[in-house]
């Protein structure tokens, strides 16, 4: 089994505000869960490489508006969380210097695909663009948040948000009330 790094977001309930973002190895996830307060909920994105842990005791981070490039992290890749105007978390991806520059210049979200090793504009092929309303960063500048106006859906599986299911006890999934705005074509 190949090891991969996953993104963990702690989210304060009921506001769904971001409390922290960290990266861990996938095999550390089980141990990480043991450090969380009782009664947490777990939402997982479509690719199972980002996990939201939700709990009332998590304290939200303070964010500030930014127009500066953030160049930290491995290979100068910075985690980027896309949220809508209501604060709903839509997706998590990565940005490099070029994607951040294009996002600032064009007003539309651009990211860097680690698997394809290339720059991409969200919605370039689907038309499901993300118009940037503002770019935020926590005071420690460890990641970025793009607050966006999402066209149709953020998720390639047709859901408005990539976080459309909750992991229940064990490996059971519960679909969340996230609108499915289209059915992807079978290739």
UniProtKB/Swiss-Prot annotation:
Homodimer. One of its GO terms (biological process) is L-histidine biosynthetic process. This is Phosphoribosyl-AMP cyclohydrolase. InterPro entries: PRib_AMP_CycHydrolase_dom, PRib_AMP_CycHydrolase_sf. One of its GO terms (cellular component) is cytoplasm. It is an enzyme of class 3 (hydrolase). It comes from the Bacteria. Belongs to the PRA-CH family. Pfam families: PRA-CH (PF01502). Its main location: cytoplasm. It catalyses: 1-(5-phospho-beta-D-ribosyl)-5'-AMP + H2O = 1-(5-phospho-beta-D-ribosyl)-5-[(5-phospho-beta-D-ribosylamino)methylideneamino]imidazole-4-carboxamide. Pathway: Amino-acid biosynthesis; L-histidine biosynthesis; L-histidine from 5-phospho-alpha-D-ribose 1-diphosphate: step 3/9. Its EC number is 3.5.4.19. The keyword DNA-binding does not apply. Coiled coil: none annotated. It is found in: Cytoplasm. GO terms for molecular function: phosphoribosyl-AMP cyclohydrolase activity. Catalyzes the hydrolysis of the adenine ring of phosphoribosyl-AMP. The keyword Lipid biosynthesis does not apply. Keywords: Amino-acid biosynthesis, Cytoplasm, Histidine biosynthesis, Hydrolase.
């Amino acid at each position: 089994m190949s090891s991969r790094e996953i993104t963990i977001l702690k989210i304060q309930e009921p506001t769904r505000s971001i409390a922290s973002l960290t990266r861990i190895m996938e095999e550390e996830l089980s141990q990480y869960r043991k450090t969380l307060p009782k009664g947490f909920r777990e939402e997982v994105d479509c690719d199972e490489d980002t996990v939201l842990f939700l709990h009332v005791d998590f304290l939200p981070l303070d964010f500030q508006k930014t127009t500066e490039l953030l160049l930290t992290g491995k290979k100068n890749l910075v985690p980027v969380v896309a949220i809508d105007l209501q604060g709903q978390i839509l997706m998590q991806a990565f940005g490099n210097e070029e994607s951040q520059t294009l996002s600032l210049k064009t007003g539309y979200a651009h990211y860097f695909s680690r698997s394809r090793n290339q720059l991409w504009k969200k919605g370039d092929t689907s038309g499901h663009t993300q118009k940037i309303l503002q770019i935020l960063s926590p005071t420690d500048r460890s990641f970025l948040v793009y607050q966006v106006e999402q066209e149709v859906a953020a998720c390639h599986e047709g859901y408005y948000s990539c976080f459309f299911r909750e992991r229940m006890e064990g490996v059971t999934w519960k679909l969340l009330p996230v609108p499915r705005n289209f059915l992807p074509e079978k290739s």
